[in-house]
C-alpha cells in the first residue's frame, strides 16, 4: 500500500460541505470516507450524488454498504460496531461485495495495538485510533504506549492508518511510528479553511515521504 492521506467526513452536516469535498479531490485527495451514522440510505445516496461523479471511485462508505455496488464507489468500511453485532454478517457482506465488485476495497476500525496482531480477514487497510487526543471528539484521548505501538506496527499484517488527533504538527510522529498513512477529521473540518489546511498537510506529508525515500 502506498503511503496516503485520507480525509473522513464529520458526522454532522456542515456548511458548503460538498463544495469543500470536491475541492479536496481537486487538490490531490485520494480517498474520502463518508461517516454519517444517522443517514438513511436515500440521504447517503443524495450526499454522494452531490459529489462530482468522476470522484466516486475515491469514496468509501461506513454505512448503507449496498450503495458501493449500485454507485460503484471505492469501497466499504466496517466499524467495530458492525463486527461486534454479528460475527457472520460482516463475513457474508465482505463476500458479497467482493463477488459484486471484485475491485472494491474493504476497511475496518480498531482501537488497541493488540488488535494489530490478529489475523487479517482481508482488509485493505485499517484505522487505529485514537493515536493522539481527538480534535473532533471531546474527551476522546490517546491511551497508547509509544513503545508497544511501534512494536505492534512492526509485527502486524495490516496496513495501518493513524486516526485521531492527526494534524500538521503530528505528521513526523506518524511517520516515526511506522503507519502506512493518516486520516484527517477535526484538523480539516474544525478549521476556518479546510481546503487550505488540507493542502498544507498534503504538501508536508509528501515532503516527508520524499525525504525518506531519498
Which residues does each predicted region cover?
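Non-cysteine beta-strand/loop elements that form the S-adenosyl-L-methionine
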Residues: 124-132
